[in-house]
Amino acid sequence: MIPAGIGHVVLPLIVVISILLMLARPHAIPEVWWISGGVLLLIVLGLVPLRLAGQAVAKGSDVYLFLMGMMLLSELAREQGVFDWAASAAVRGAHGSCSRLFLLVYSVGTLVTILLSNDATAVVLTPAILTAVRKAKVSPLPYLFVCAFIANAASFVLPISNPANLVVFHTGMPPLGRWLSDFGVPSLLSILMTFVVMRLLFRSELCKSIECEVEDAMLSRNGKLVLVGLGLMVAVLLTASAMKTDLGLPTCLAALVITASVSIKSKSSPIKLAREISWGTLLLVAGLFVMVDAVESQGALNVTQRWLAWATGLGQSVGAMAVGFAVGIANNVVNNLPLGLIAGGTIQAAHTKGLIANAVLIGV
């Protein structure tokens, strides 16, 4: 056990070091080990009671369910060739024009991000796009950049477009109508501006032609079933969002139903899919919930609350710009999950609403 006076120093120090190690990943050790190790150390040293750690983990149940559902669906779609089919269709639809291919890849990336979350675009769609453009024998760089940037630009079109959206708003998630009212125009501008900048940046590469023909990747019956299932799932989630219902459980249940349907139809075991899910990500998020609760209990979020109050004092418009800019920079330095948890905790503790709170989410 550590004396209370020293604990006020040791606790935030352990949290900061754990997050820095998570970002640096020395010796290529996965992020989850650094965060889990930090949480375990906090508990062993008596800085965080086991009961409070359990309560902090329980707070993230909706996020865990959402992540599980989205990861399962993304892996199912990848296994059934949905992403390969989409990438191949984009290349063939370009009809020999790199410029048209750029637009099609951007459109596919936008759609995947909006409906399946930015993780699906970054982790699953990107390799499929890379394979397709290599077969077309064109420079892959513009299209890889597109996947990376649209995963951010379109990540706040809908609540389901980014797990960080659930982390930031947590129990205060706005209903769908208000979400679209608040974020519809900013997200559209984000998507359009990103396209313009990327298009100008790669204008020389996009003036070239695609000389190589690419075979069309046929979508299997199971792949079509997955597509239909995804459409139904999105409809369910939008309905749940409109009714201001938690999104985690509907996402997870929809993913399980779709997976079961495909597994029964194809007479295959879903165990392989379960193995492909990044369970470490769930542990990482759970550990971050514990750490943010721990520093909040020590009053460490008072600094961010004071800064938020200062920004609010500048007025809604100026304050929102300052907050969005600062959070955006911090997001690139740190990571959207720990930053989203800290930002969400600060918003809830300070009871911040309106334009300032929206700017925080856009920054994340």
Predicted segments with their positions:
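Hydrophobic mid-bilayer segments of alpha-helices in multi-pass membrane transport proteins
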Residues: G7-I19, H27-V48, G60-L72, V124, ...
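Intrinsically disordered, low-complexity non-transmembrane regions of multi-pass membrane transporters
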Residues: M1-I14, S88, R92-H95, R199-L230, ...
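Alpha-helical transmembrane segments and, especially, the helix-loop junctions at the ends
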Residues: T113-V123, P140-M173, T194-R199, G328-G344, ...
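Juxtamembrane and boundary regions of transmembrane helices in multi-pass small-molecule transporters
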Residues: V138, V157, G177-R221, L225-V228, ...
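Structural signature of hydrophobic alpha-helical transmembrane segments
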Residues: I2-L13, G60-L72, N118-A122, A153-F156, ...
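Interfacial loop-to-helix junctions that mark the boundaries of transmembrane helices
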Residues: M1-G7, P26-I29, L52-V63, L176-P186, ...
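Hydrophobic alpha-helical transmembrane segments
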Residues: P12-L13, W33-G37, Y64-L65, S99-S107, ...
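Membrane-embedded alpha-helical segments and adjacent helix-loop junctions characteristic
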Residues: P3, R51-P142, G280-T352
